[in-house]
């Protein structure tokens, strides 16, 4: 039941809900949309890094090289490899005695 369709009224036996007809198509549609929204919010919080990384970079691992001459492709690969090699130099080996 949606909170927007419920009304609590005091009766002799205590509190009871007088809800609108739950077979109303609008209530059913709103309930389904609410449940789907809740599921998507939970999945978004659990997997936001994976989801947004996929959206940002797509399924490919790097920029497209379609239409680029082979010499430029090789130059790009060398630049990428040298950048990785430079990053490897930041690690420090610590020996415990």
From Swiss-Prot:
Stretches for region Disordered: 60-83
Keyword Lipoprotein carried by entry: yes
Positions marked as site (Essential for channel activity, possibly by being protonated during channel activation, and by forming the channel gate and the selective filter): 37
Regulation: The M2 protein from most influenza A strains is inhibited by amantadine and rimantadine, resulting in viral uncoating incapacity. Emergence of amantadine-resistant variants is usually rapid.
GO cellular component: host cell plasma membrane; membrane; virion membrane
GO MF, one annotated term: proton transmembrane transporter activity
Superkingdom: Viruses
Lipid attachment site numbers (S-palmitoyl cysteine): 50
Keywords (A to Z) from UniProt: Disulfide bond, Host cell membrane, Host membrane, Host-virus interaction, Hydrogen ion transport, Inhibition of host autophagy by virus, Ion channel, Ion transport, Lipoprotein, Membrane, Palmitate, Phosphoprotein, Signal-anchor, Transmembrane, Transmembrane helix, Transport, Viral ion channel, Virion
Transmembrane segments: 23-43
Membrane topology: Single-pass type III membrane protein
Residues with PTM Phosphoserine: 64, 82
Virion surface topological segments: 1-22
Comment field (misc): When the channel is activated, one or more imidazole moieties of His-37 probably become bi-protonated.
Function according to Swiss-Prot or TrEMBL: Forms a proton-selective ion channel that is necessary for the efficient release of the viral genome during virus entry. After attaching to the cell surface, the virion enters the cell by endocytosis. Acidification of the endosome triggers M2 ion channel activity.
Entry domain remark: Cytoplasmic tail plays an important role in virion assembly and morphogenesis.
Record-linked HAMAP family: INFV_M2 (MF_04069)
Family per similarity comment: Belongs to the influenza viruses matrix protein M2 family.
This protein's name: Matrix protein 2
Organism encoding this protein: Influenza A virus (strain A/Turkey/Ontario/7732/1966 H5N9)
Gene, per the UniProt record: M
